[in-house]
Swiss-Prot record:
Catalytic center residues: 138, 545
Function: Forms oxaloacetate, a four-carbon dicarboxylic acid source for the tricarboxylic acid cycle.
Protein name, as recorded: Phosphoenolpyruvate carboxylase
UniProt entry keywords in alphabetical sequence: Carbon dioxide fixation, Lyase, Magnesium
Cofactor(s) the protein needs: Mg(2+)
PROSITE patterns, per database record: PEPCASE_1, PEPCASE_2
Keyword Ion transport assigned: no
EC numbers on record: 4.1.1.31
One GO cellular component term noted in the UniProt record for this chain: cytosol
The reaction(s) this protein catalyses: oxaloacetate + phosphate = phosphoenolpyruvate + hydrogencarbonate
Regions crossing the membrane: none
GO molecular function (one): phosphoenolpyruvate carboxylase activity
GO biological process: carbon fixation; oxaloacetate metabolic process; tricarboxylic acid cycle
């Protein structure tokens, strides 16, 4: 690693040394020597020593069941410690001094000034800025909450050690604490013994809000204001809401039978309880601070004459929040509430108005510095979190709504709605939506499945407007899918409009998105209720699983572009909701590059994007890291709107159409067309064993008896990442590029790389995937776990991977992958030394596991789970 990363190198070395001491104390010298020998063999193997490679295979294959767990844990925990050190590096003083990121807000405003950008235009764009992060429960978040807490404490220790004026005694105290935390982690079982419930997942999300985002959001808003003020010459408005937090935890029931209406209600109560708790802590501290006696005449007229007027107001709020806490505590405990709704805080304005009055009075009385202290932080939190802490999305699969309405129409003698033509469905739905009479008879008893759908809608009806952000329909394919949800909400007594969001996921659905939305917008009733605002969700995971990365990316781009043009023509404000994941196969890319590769004008109403599991932890898990993430998002959105990327040239579109068709044919030819593919996939990856790992509450398959098509996109990608073939993220892409170049269109491809962010980002993503892949390791899975007659498939795929790597290198004019980002290349090289043994151990363990699946040794099963989580840590992503 380069000189500027000396602290990172030193931190990794120190953490590794402390882990070694811990292992020595816990397991003894023999185990430590074995681990150290494996590490050296792995390092030499990576350096090209064939003898070391064979010795590594022999050593790992001969480890007893008894010793295999500590060996797996050692490499897994080292990779977790490396992740901690790298996460800290991004916010360290050394990193800040060494790099002035061209992607930061401050650098963007410098460029805007150099280009004489209009102050008025910049101000208008900043005031419209919206970053809405939707936190989702990730079924492959492999790290337990108990360990995450220890990892946060380790990060804090690294921060303290960066102070150069520490005495030797102070340094020793911090290092002893580090050693203790590493020992605590070693003696903690990293594998959950039980699968988390949806409520557990929601509590995990709220813990992240409390421990990181609660501090990060006000800090980011201050940073945004200071940076903008240098350009504008004045402050942004206090009520600015550039960050909004929403959540699928407790609301996403697509394919998860454990998320019920009762769970949704419980999570909503818990969110309000947690919000009251956090605001109560803030308000109690504020009561100590606001001891000033002077206030404005308007403030005195409104709140009366008091010796300490601000404390009077704040203490009243404290009493209301205390009552609010008790009210929701009673609901969560299934007790009759001790206080009435009239005594508690249910609306944001009940908090905002009195505190904003305090803020204005303090400024009018010459106490701006006090107003801009803790009070301003609380106002920012009210703006961004509100008294519900986050808004909730409800998500359900489209056929569940179709089945519910079909059950109703059959009962009332209208026939089977699910069998009707689309025009007939729409006519029926519009007629019922326009009718004042109820559709559902009072004496009707629905099936349990339909009752659950209706109960969920009734829970929505019980909430105040704004608590539920939207209702997302997965696998949306028609206008009737959207109208059906509106009808179910109406029949359940929802008294206000809720945005209903179609999620277009497959290649065919993305291509049809414009047509579906045009049909919807042509419905008079629908145009009347949406108030010229529409949200559409773009699915990245399932489209990539359906058609491969290249075809899916282009379909996503074209769908967004078409929707932007359609809504602009109709005068409708469009918000695009991006269902991205952390991996390339799920739309993942560095945030700044990903946003600037979107179609022009697609971010003018802000960004709404899912943040999942381990990516929440990596990008938002520490306050300083979260501030940097918000800064990158804000910079990219503002740049996309103020300095938009170029429209793709007609010849670029033609090339992308060709690449899409060729790559999709290649991808589907393997995944769908080869009869041996499914048995090969099941043998060559730990896909079957993944279901045994109690990671998330949601089952890995929509249909437990189905094949690859029924497998969720996340475990599909997770399985291929484990065996280092990384197939979903590249299959078809490189081969398609190669074919187009061979047709004599290489010059156009090179121009696309140089001048079109969309295409250059795709190539950069491929390069990252290739850097993490490994054909030799993939071959070890095949030779040990796959029947010989299926080996040809792996050999063909690895040959294609090697050819694709050469194709991408030729485009970037480089001899080695990631040579333009040396610190990332170095990081991957370091991780490989520790991840390789885990991969080889996993091969050995899968072999032992499958030899006698009815009587698996518990140590083998436990060690296998550890290799899965360790490889996930080494790859820095799961699914």
């Amino acid at each position: 690693m380069t000189q500027e990363y000396s602290t990172l190198r030193n931190n990794i070395s120190m953490l590794g040394r402390f882990l070694g001491e811990t292992i020595n104390d816990a397991q003894g010298e023999d185990i430590l020597e074995l681990i150290e020998n494996i590490r050296k063999l792995s390092r030499n193997s990576r350096a090209g020593d064939d003898k070391a490679r064979q010795a590594l295979l022999d050593t790992l294959g001969s480890i007893s069941n008894e010793n295999i767990i500590p060996v797996a844990r050692a490499f897994s925990q080292f990779l977790n410690l490396t992740n901690i050190a790298e996460q800290y590096q991004t916010i360290s003083r050394e990193h800040s001094l060494a790099q002035s990121s061209s992607q930061s807000l401050s650098e963007l405003f410098k460029r805007l000034k150099e280009q004489n950008a209009s102050v008025e235009e910049v101000h208008k764009t900043v005031e419209k800025l919206l970053i809405e992060l939707v936190l989702t429960a990730h079924p492959t978040e492999t790290t337990r909450r108990s360990l995450i807490h220890k990892h946060i404490e380790i990060n804090k220790c690294l921060s303290k050690l960066e102070h150069h004026d520490l005495t030797e005694k102070e340094r020793n105290i911090i290092e002893r604490l580090l050693l203790r935390l590493i020992a605590e982690a070693w003696h903690t079982n990293e594998i959950r013994t039980v699968r988390p419930t949806p409520f557990d997942e929601a509590k995990w999300g709220f813990a992240m809000l409390e421990n990181s985002l609660w501090q990060a959001v006000p800090e980011f808003l201050r940073q945004l204001n200071e940076t903008a003020r240098e350009f504008l010459g004045y402050d942004l408005s206090v009520g600015l809401k550039p960050v909004r937090i929403s959540s699928w935890m407790g609301g996403d029931r697509d394919g998860n039978p454990f998320v019920t209406a009762q769970i949704t209600k419980k999570v909503l109560y818990f969110a309000r309880w947690k919000a009251a708790d956090l605001f109560l802590q803030d308000i109690s501290k504020l009561a100590d601070e606001l001891s000033m006696m002077k206030c404005s005449d308007e403030f005195r007229d409104k709140y009366g004459e008091h010796l300490e007027p601000y404390r009077f107001v704040v203490k009243n709020l404290r009493n209301q929040l205390t009552a609010t806490l008790a009210y929701f505590d009673d609901h969560l405990s299934n007790r009759t509430p001790r206080v009435s709704e009239s005594e508690i805080i249910l609306e944001d304005n009940q908090l905002w108005e009195p505190l904003y009055d305090c803020y204005q009075s303090l400024i009018q009385c010459g106490m701006r510095i006090i107003a801009n202290g803790s009070l301003l932080n609380i106002l920012h939190r009210i703006s961004c979190f509100g008294v519900t802490l986050s808004q909730m999305d409800i998500r359900q699969e489209s056929t569940r709504h179709t089945d519910a309405i079909a059950e109703i129409t059959r009962y009332i003698g209208l026939g089977d709605y699910s069998q009707w033509m689309e025009d007939d469905k729409q006519a029926f739905l519009i007629r019922e939506l326009s009718s004042r009479r109820p559709l559902i008879p009072q004496n009707w008893t629905p099936s349990p499945e339909t009752k659950e759908i209706l109960d969920t809608c009734k829970v929505i009806a019980q909430q105040k407007q704004g608590v539920i952000a939207c209702y997302v329909i997965s696998m949306a394919r028609s206008a009737s899918d959207v109208l059906a949800v509106h009808l179910l909400l109406k029949e359940s007594g929802v008294p206000y409009h809720i945005p209903v969001v179609p999620l277009f996921e497959t290649l065919e659905d993305l291509d049809a998105a414009e047509k579906v939305m045009t049909q919807l917008f042509n419905v008079g009733w629908y145009r009347g209720v949406i108030n010229n605002r529409q949200m559409v969700m773009i699915g990245y995971s399932d489209s990539a699983k359906d058609a491969g990365m290249m075809a899916a990316s282009w379909a996503q781009y074209r769908a967004q572009e078409a929707l932007v043009n359609l809504t602009e023509k109709l005068g409708i404000e469009l918000t695009l909701f991006h269902g991205r994941g952390g991996t390339i196969g799920r739309g993942g890319a560095p945030a700044h590059a990903a946003l600037l590769s979107q179609p022009p004008r697609s971010l003018k109403n802000g960004l709404r994007v899912t943040e999942q599991g381990e990516m929440i932890r990596f990008k938002l898990g520490l306050p300083a890291v979260a501030v940097e993430t918000f800064d990158l998002y804000a910079s990219a959105i503002l740049e996309a709107n103020l300095l938009p990327p170029p429209e793709p040239k007609p010849e670029w579109r033609t090339i992308m159409d060709e690449l899409s068709t060729i790559s999709c044919d290649i991808y589907r030819g393997v995944v769908r067309g080869d009869k041996d593919f499914v048995p090969y996939f099941r043998s060559a990856t730990p896909e079957q064993e993944l279901s045994k790992l109690p990671l998330g509450s949601r089952p890995a398959k929509r249909n437990p008896n189905g094949g690859v098509e029924s497998l969720r996109a996340i475990p599909w990608i997770f399985a291929w990442m484990q065996n280092r073939l990384m197939l979903p993220a590249w299959l078809g892409a490189g081969a398609a590029i190669r074919q187009v170049i061979e047709q004599g269109k290489g010059d156009i491809i090179h121009k696309m790389c140089e001048n079109w962010p969309f295409f250059s980002t795709r190539i950069g993503m491929l390069e990252m995937v290739f850097s993490k892949s490994d054909t030799w390791l993939s071959q070890q899975y095949d030779q040990r776990l796959v029947k010989k007659e299926l080996w040809y498939l792996g050999e063909n795929l690895r040959k294609q991977l090697e050819d694709d790597i050469q194709t991408v290198l030729s485009l970037s004019h480089q001899s080695e992958l990631m040579s333009d980002l040396p610190w990332i290349a170095d990081s991957i090289a370091l991780r490989n030394i520790y991840t390789d043994p885990l991969n080889l151990l996993q091969v050995e363990l899968l072999h032992r596991f499958r030899e006698n699946p009815e009587q698996v040794n518990p140590d083998v099963e436990q060690a296998l789970m550890i290799t899965i989580t360790g490889i996930a840590a080494g790859m820095r992503n799961t699914g």
